[in-house]
């Protein structure tokens, strides 16, 4: 979860301007100096060897903040690093324990990481440390990343480290540019050009095994997720950084060491092109993009990289491991084995083979020397001998302000993007800070006596001619640029957490969804079945009743404000199954109106006149509603005799009903949580304008949208509890499906030619896939909100009620990560949902009386009903075979007892739910409407009905004056007379809005 993120922390010149230098602190043979990076669990400092005055990086981990899993990862990292001694792997120099901290002393990599080197490639010529490099090997230009010579150099060194790991059956599992650290060229140490001289654990610590000594040296870092995995074994833990994660890991499948090769392919592509091959807002969308790409790796038209590199990238970026090249083929590829082409005359390759194999552990390596003994003594606490000597060089430390960045968990403390040349005069640590030097060289202060070598013009001219003769027109594409900006902004938010760790529950849910999706018995006749992790198969026309613009879910679409085409999916099936369609029933007309309204329930036309904090909507316009798959209009619940859902339902239909009801409730809660989430995240650059008329669409003033710390805490708490509630409902939905599937698997009943059972199975499978995708999405967002909350709480004054020290443990939310999340005692999902339901209904009722936005009134009423049903979900657990009458009887008994032991919100919702069910089924005894009204009479001020009461009594507002209208009028008048205030209007007022727009269902001749 960000603890083991070294690469972004080796940038000592990039300090916050409001942070003072930390006091020096002795740690063994080292002195800890200024802080250079901070994460959720660790702080990284610059350090210096006390005797030699050479530099190290010291990572101080606070053990009290770590969960058991993170402690295991830390112990694993220490254990692995103690065994790894290779020039292209960051070495662990020493380890010191205290009562509350572990201090890891690591090799210092002065040039930062490869990510910032790539991002700052256009400013490298401004630094004396890379000026010569860029003069010899200039950047190819637009549509490209680094010069191919530099790309091949870094790839050879990375491959050398990977071969070393493979010889020891180790997989890294988190290879990415941020974990590839760079050191100044080894030749710069010999010439005395490098100011920041790192501590050397051995003679060859900074002597490359392959590549060029005149170019920066690459080292693989961050072994927090590494593990031993023999060639015949498979792993199944999802961990690492999503953007560079292999598809098999994203799909929660077992994987082997080939997962590292995919990551190498993504890194190689980014070095060549300047961006990752697949970019998405979260790991769910990422796997969709990878699968939709179908191994067709394309390159920008202006990119002139060689065909050998393209072939290697395409061989590495195969989404199926069986199709991906193996390690033997990879290590034997000519890009790694042949000399680097295009070198200048004075950059002769090293004498070693470019892919110099490293010996196996027992084959007598270079480490069987006194140096190794010294290293082992140091790791065990012994006194370290003096390191290998360097040429005399002026060693001075310069402190530079780190640009202010949004407060985010385990963020990268890299360059602000526009680096400047280092100062001419070195200054002591206490001097005034200077501006940051170039991105990749942020930790290296400038040297006054730096010697510039004359640039070689041959390669420069060759590169320019190659670019000029490419024949590609230099056409600006503002549309693509804007799209990239929005995608990048969304990506920065989504990947603010550097790692994804999925708990066991999520893995189980995804495994069950996969089992159901790929079971042969579920495949036959599956109309409109979803593809893996998709809303609908690409190019598949939606079934009747679905939006023709269906598209896969965008988990964080709301960031950029783009319209969600798939949010227009109708929800008729959800209500067809609940309400009968008998032409002889008054309630069937009401259900028909509900069905008509449900099509707009979460569509783009949603416009209830509602506001919340900062003007958010509930639900927001742009999120993926349930169901997110094309579905036919046929209802499994409606029988030929027009009967209603009841005891006569078969098990399949009852399961479908319960499953879709639970999923729909989770969707409503999710929509409410999205309102809070939307206010916590910054908009993309091109989405500064919100929806028309939305009070919350003001320009964002800062990364937090101009929110105060108090507001961030409040919104984070509310979003978190709502997301947790949505997760519980989604988990319950999956449990319902799992019980059904277990029963079906035992009985093998799906194998028979039963049309109803097959349709039910397909429908359940569709819902399960939707639930799986939504669960993964909500889990991702809940973790983001959790980190946001934890960080915001720490920024509060110590006497603030929401400060962690002032919150009791009893109000904590269990967290499977580092520590419990503590929320304010008065923030609960049920309270928020109850108040929101009343608010929506109250405003809708006023609009209904005045005749404004009747369609929005219907939507608000139905949404509020679902929200109250979600509150009741923990009380009335719906299981297959359980009758609805028992639930209503329980609700009535609770009300008759006066609800002594239950909150008033639950009493009201129970009464309302039972009475609402009685309206659907008038033949069954129900709760009188006045019982529901009495529950809130003492809380809500009455608002008297005016002319509409008389209008309804006389039938003037009803389009049907026949017997059906009379039945509807009877129900409506009874409810309106018994409910003279709007609090219980969910169960009375909405009927009148439907009655004003209902057409006769049976053409009685009076309409």
Swiss-Prot record:
Root EC class: transferase
Biological process per Gene Ontology, one example term: reticulophagy
InterPro entries (alphabetical): Atg1-like, ATG1-like_MIT2, Atg1-like_tMIT, Kinase-like_dom_sf, Prot_kinase_dom, Protein_kinase_ATP_BS, Ser/Thr_kinase_AS
Ranges of Low complexity composition bias in the record: 534-555, 805-817
Complex and partners: Homodimer. Forms a ternary complex with ATG13 and ATG17.
Family: Belongs to the protein kinase superfamily. Ser/Thr protein kinase family. APG1/unc-51/ULK1 subfamily.
Protein name, entry field: Serine/threonine-protein kinase atg1
């Amino acid at each position: 979860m960000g603890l083991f993120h070294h690469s972004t922390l080796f940038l000592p010149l990039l300090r916050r301007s409001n942070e003072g230098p930390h006091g020096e602190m002795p740690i063994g043979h080292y002195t800890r100096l200024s802080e250079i990076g901070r994460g959720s669990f660790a702080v990284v400092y610059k350090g210096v060897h006390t005797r030699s005055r050479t530099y190290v990086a010291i990572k101080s981990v606070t053990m009290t903040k770590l969960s058991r899993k993170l402690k295991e990862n830390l112990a694993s990292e220490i254990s692995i690093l103690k065994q790894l001694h290779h020039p292209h792997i960051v070495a662990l120099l020493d380890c010191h324990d205290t009562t509350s901290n572990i201090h890891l002393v690591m090799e210092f990599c002065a040039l930062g990481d490869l990510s910032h080197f790539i991002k700052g490639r256009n400013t490298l010529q401004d630094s004396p440390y890379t000026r010569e490099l860029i003069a010899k090997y200039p950047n190819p230009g637009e549509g490209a990343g680094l010069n191919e010579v530099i790309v091949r150099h870094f790839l050879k060194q990375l491959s050398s480290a990977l071969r070393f790991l493979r010889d020891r059956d180790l997989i890294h599992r988190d290879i990415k540019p941020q974990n590839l650290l760079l050191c100044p060229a080894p030749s710069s140490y010999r010439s005395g050009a490098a100011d920041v001289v790192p501590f050397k654990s051995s003679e060859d610590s900074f002597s490359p095994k392959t590549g060029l000594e005149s170019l920066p040296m690459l080292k693989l870092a961050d072994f927090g997720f590494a593990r031993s995995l023999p060639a015949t074994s498979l792993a199944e833990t999802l961990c690492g950084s999503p953007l560079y994660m292999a598809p098999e890991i994203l799909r929660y499948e077992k994987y082997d060491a080939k997962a590292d090769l995919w990551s190498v392919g993504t890194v190689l592509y980014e070095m060549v092109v300047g961006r990752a091959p697949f970019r998405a807002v979260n790991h769910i969308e990422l796997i969709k993009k990878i699968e939709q790409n179908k191994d067709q790796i394309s390159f920008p038209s202006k990119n002139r990289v060689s065909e050998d590199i393209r072939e290697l990238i395409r061989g590495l970026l195969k989404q199926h491991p069986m199709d991906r090249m193996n390690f033997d083929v990879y290590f034997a590829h000519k890009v790694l084995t042949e000399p680097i082409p295009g070198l200048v005359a004075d950059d002769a390759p090293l004498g070693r083979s470019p892919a110099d194999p490293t010996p196996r552990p027992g084959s007598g390596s270079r480490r069987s020397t006194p140096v190794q003994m010294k290293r082992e003594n140091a790791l065990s606490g012994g006194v370290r001998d003096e390191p290998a000597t360097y040429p005399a060089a002026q060693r001075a430390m310069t402190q530079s302000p780190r640009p202010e960045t949004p407060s985010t968990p385990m963020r990268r403390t890299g360059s602000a993007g526009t680096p400047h040349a280092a100062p001419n005069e070195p200054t002591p640590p206490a001097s005034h800070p200077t501006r940051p030097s170039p991105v990749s060289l942020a930790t290296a202060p400038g040297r006054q006596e730096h010697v510039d070598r004359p640039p070689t013009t041959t390669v420069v001219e060759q590169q320019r001619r190659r670019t000029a003769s490419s024949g590609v027109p230099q056409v600006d594409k503002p549309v693509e640029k804007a799209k990239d900006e929005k995608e990048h902004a969304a990506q920065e938010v989504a990947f603010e957490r550097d790692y994804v760790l999925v708990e066991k529950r999520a893995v189980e849910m995804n495994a069950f969804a996969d089992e159901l999706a790929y079971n042969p018995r579920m495949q036959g006749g599956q109309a409109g079945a979803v593809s893996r992790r998709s809303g609908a198969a690409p190019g598949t026309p939606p079934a009747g009743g679905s939006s023709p613009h269906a598209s896969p879910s965008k988990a964080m679409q709301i960031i950029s404000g783009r319209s969600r085409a798939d949010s227009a999916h109708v929800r008729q099936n959800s209500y067809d199954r609940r309400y009968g369609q008998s032409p002889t029933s008054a309630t069937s007309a009401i259900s028909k109106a509900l069905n008509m309204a449900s099509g707009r329930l979460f569509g783009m036309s949603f416009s209830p006149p509602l506001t919340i904090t900062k003007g958010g909507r509930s639900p927001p316009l742009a999120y993926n509603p349930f169901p997110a798959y094309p579905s036919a209009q046929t209802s499994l619940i409606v029988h030929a005799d027009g009967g209603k859902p009841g005891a006569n339902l078969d098990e399949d239909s009852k399961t479908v009903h319960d499953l879709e009801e639970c999923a729909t409730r989770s969707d409503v809660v999710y929509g409410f949580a999205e309102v809070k989430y939307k206010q916590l995240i910054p908009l993309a650059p091109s989405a500064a304008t919100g929806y028309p008329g939305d009070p919350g669409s003001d320009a964002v003033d800062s990364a937090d949208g101009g929110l105060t710390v108090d507001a961030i805490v409040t919104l984070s708490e509310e979003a978190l509890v709502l997301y947790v509630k949505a997760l519980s409902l989604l988990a319950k939905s999956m449990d319902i499906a799992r019980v059904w599937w277990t029963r079906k698997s035992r009985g093998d009943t799906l194998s028979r030619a039963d049309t109803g059972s097959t349709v039910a199975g397909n429908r359940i499978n569709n819902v399960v896939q939707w639930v799986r995708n939504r669960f993964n999405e909500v889990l991702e967002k809940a973790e983001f909100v959790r980190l946001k909350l934890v960080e915001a709480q720490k920024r509060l004054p110590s006497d603030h009620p929401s400060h962690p020290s002032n919150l009791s443990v009893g109000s904590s939310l269990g967290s499977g990560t580092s520590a419990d999340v503590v929320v304010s005692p008065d923030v609960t999902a049920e309270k928020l949902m109850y108040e929101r339901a009343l608010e929506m209904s109250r405003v809708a009722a006023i609009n209904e009386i005045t005749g404004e936005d009747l369609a929005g009134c219907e939507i608000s009423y139905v949404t509020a009903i679902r929200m109250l049903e979600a509150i009741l979900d923990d009380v009335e657990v719906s299981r297959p075979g359980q009758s609805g009458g028992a639930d209503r009887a329980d609700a009535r008994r609770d009300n008759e007892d006066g609800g002594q032991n239950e909150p008033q919100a639950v009493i009201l919702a129970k009464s309302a739910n039972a009475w609402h069910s009685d309206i659907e089924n008038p033949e069954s005894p129900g709760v009188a409407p006045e019982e529901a009204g009495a529950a809130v009479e003492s809380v809500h001020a009455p608002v008297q009905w005016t002319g509409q009461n008389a209008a309804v009594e006389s039938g003037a507002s009803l389009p049907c004056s026949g017997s059906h209208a009379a039945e509807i009028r009877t129900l409506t008048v009874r409810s309106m007379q018994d409910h003279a205030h709007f609090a219980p209007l969910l169960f009375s007022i909405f009927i009148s809005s439907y009655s004003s727009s209902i057409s006769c269902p049976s053409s009685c001749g009076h309409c």
